[in-house]
Each structure stands twice: as structure tokens, then as C-alpha cells.
């Protein structure tokens, strides 16, 4: 069973997160994690953009982690500001975008996933 394509998968516990990470690593897919918080205004601003990128770049796995819900995961990756977008390749951190910076986020996705659908970008 492959990870869902074209959607953002919200992880609500560490087991769920670990399962998604393992599945993506086995499939050779880049994982893009949106570290967010319910109280974070910029996070709410960028969430629909992140969801749009999940549709545009089905070759990657898009995960959403609430830092208050999964503190241990946020601490593992040294997340200190929200939103933080972490790029994981082959189980290791490959890149990071901090802040609701739409263009930087898209450019980093293209860099790691490929320009699969970049021509359809806004």
C-alpha cells in the first residue's frame, strides 16, 4: 500500500509519523514535513499553499506535524520556529525552509523532487 499521493497527511502520534517516514524511505520518496501550530498565524496562511504543492508534486510525501501534539518529533529535528518545512531524503535531513515563504518553499521542492509540475506554478 503506497502513501497517499497529492494530499497532506496529518500525523497525530509518533507511531503514525514513524510509519509514514518508513513507508516513504522504502519507496525512495522525499518527505516534506510541515511543522505547524494551531496558534501560528503564518502557519494558517501557508497551509493551503502546502496542500496545493502536495497536489502539484505527487512524487513526494507531504506530512503535517503539530509541534504541540508531537513535541518529541519537533525536538528530534530541532524545530524552533513555525512554520518549518523539513526535507527528508533517504531518512536524513536534506534541507529546511523556515517561515511562510511560498517561493522559497516551492523552489526547495523543485530542487529535491524535480520540476514535475513547476510549470503550472503561480
Swiss-Prot record:
Stored InterPro entries: Thioredoxin (IPR005746), Thioredoxin-like_sf (IPR036249), Thioredoxin_CS (IPR017937), Thioredoxin_domain (IPR013766), Thioredoxin_H-type-like (IPR050620)
Its induction note reads: By methyl viologen and chilling in roots and shoots.
Q: Which Pfam families match?
A: Thioredoxin (PF00085)
> Where found?
Cytoplasm
Coiled-coil ranges from the UniProt annotation: none
Q: Where is the active site?
A: 40 (nucleophile), 43 (nucleophile)
**Highest taxon of source:** Eukaryota
Q: Where is the Thioredoxin domain?
A: 2-118
**What is one Gene Ontology biological process annotated in the Swiss-Prot or TrEMBL record?**
response to cold
Tissue specificity comment: Expressed in the phloem companion cells of leaf sheaths and stems.
Q: Does the keyword Phosphoprotein apply?
A: no
UniProt GO molecular function? enzyme inhibitor activity; oxidoreductase activity, acting on a sulfur group of donors, disulfide as acceptor; protein-disulfide reductase activity
Annotated site, Deprotonates C-terminal active site Cys, chain positions = 34
One term under GO cellular component:
cytoplasm
Q: Which UniProt keywords apply?
A: Cytoplasm, Disulfide bond, Electron transport, Redox-active center, Transport
Site label Contributes to redox potential value, positions: 41-42
CDD domains, per database record? TRX_family
- Provide the disulphide bond pattern: 40-43
Family listed: Belongs to the thioredoxin family. Plant H-type subfamily.
Instruction: Report the protein's function.
Output: Thiol-disulfide oxidoreductase involved in the redox regulation of MAP kinases. Under reducing conditions, inhibits MPK1 and MPK5 kinase activities. Mediates its own transport from cell-to-cell through plasmodesmata. Possesses insulin disulfide bonds reducing activity.
Record-given protein name? Thioredoxin H1
Name of the gene encoding the protein in the UniProt record: TRXH
Amino acid at each position: 500500500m503506497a502513501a497517499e499521493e497529492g494530499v497532506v497527511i496529518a500525523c497525530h502520534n509518533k507511531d503514525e509519523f514513524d510509519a509514514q517516514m518508513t513507508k516513504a524511505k522504502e519507496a525512495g520518496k522525499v518527505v516534506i514535513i510541515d511543522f505547524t501550530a494551531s496558534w501560528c498565524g503564518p502557519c494558517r496562511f501557508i497551509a493551503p499553499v502546502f496542500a496545493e504543492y502536495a497536489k502539484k508534486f505527487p512524487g513526494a510525501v507531504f506530512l503535517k506535524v503539530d509541534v504541540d501534539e508531537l513535541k518529541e518529533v519537533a525536538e528530534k529535528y530541532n524545530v524552533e520556529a513555525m512554520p518549518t518545512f523539513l526535507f527528508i531524503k533517504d531518512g536524513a535531513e536534506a534541507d529546511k525552509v523556515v517561515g511562510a515563504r511560498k517561493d522559497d518553499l516551492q523552489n526547495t521542492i523543485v530542487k529535491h523532487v524535480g520540476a514535475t509540475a513547476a510549470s503550472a506554478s503561480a
